[in-house]
């Protein structure tokens, strides 16, 4: 699984739209969309902010990486 797909899975499990997630971590809907489609790569700090907004963290996110 790639970062974008895994983030999208987490976002949908949290019943959030891209817009709602973007507002939570001060990013645009467009940037969230680009990350989920693997067209953009977030910095570690940005990925951490997104994961915190989804109730997760970097350790858990990469723990069970396939």
Segments and roles (model prediction):
Residues 7, 21-22, 32-35, 61:
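Conserved hydrophobic/aromatic packing and binding residues within compact polymer-binding modules
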Residues 63-66:
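Short, charged recognition helix plus adjacent turn
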